[in-house]
Regions:
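Sec-dependent signal peptide recognition
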Residues: 1-7
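Rhodanese-like catalytic fold shared by cysteine-dependent sulfurtransferases
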Residues: 16-43, 72-76, 80-81, 87-166
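Residue-level preference for short coil/turn positions at secondary-structure junctions
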Residues: 56-58, 99-100
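Short hydrophobic beta-strand that contains or immediately precedes a catalytic carboxylate
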Residues: 61-66, 79-82
């Protein structure tokens, strides 16, 4: 009897799995956005040569969504840093401007070096994935992604570091 009562209380007081209590978080919406973006993303993947050529076009923004520290330690020449954790409608508008502007993205997992500042992340959690989904979700659909693994020591990459002020 006591077991039945405890089980009934646990069931009655457990939150429903699908129920979102926070009206500012929409996990189901994020899952749908991810499904919607999946096929679109497949057509937006670039080789290094395509990425580099696209990066030379007027108005094209090379967006590095890694942390400010990682960006300062090294990034592709011409890239602009807006850390993924700082993505908001306002910060994206300031950094990108026009929602039709061509955007190129890359992340740690595009580099074979696997050392600071581009330690390889878990492949399912590669920053490119979240960055792509979020940019499209915020209305910046003209985004393309580097889909090649390169060595940042290769001169063609144009890897630069930001000098640390002393």
């Amino acid at each position: 009897m006591l077991r039945t009562l405890v089980a009934a209380l646990l069931i009655a007081t457990a939150p429903a799995e699908a129920e979102d209590r926070n009206p500012l978080i929409d996990y189901a919406g994020f899952q749908q956005l991810t499904r919607d973006v999946s096929a679109y993303r497949q057509g937006r993947l670039l080789s290094w040569n395509e990425f580099e050529k696209a990066g030379r076009q007027p108005r094209t923004l090379i967006l590095d969504a890694r942390s400010a520290d990682a960006f300062a330690a090294g990034h592709i020449k011409g890239a602009v840093n807006l850390p993924f954790t700082d993505f908001t409608a306002a910060s994206l508008a300031r950094a990108i401007g026009d929602k039709d502007r061509p955007i190129l993205i890359y992340c740690n997992n595009n580099f074979s070096n696997n050392k600071a500042p581009v330690e390889t992340k878990a492949i399912r959690l590669a920053l490119n994935i979240q960055t792509f989904i979020n940019l499209v979700g915020y209305g910046y659909a003209n985004v393309r992604e580097l889909n090649e693994v390169v060595d940042f020591n290769d001169p063609k990459i144009g890897w630069v570091t930001t000098p640390v002020a002393t």
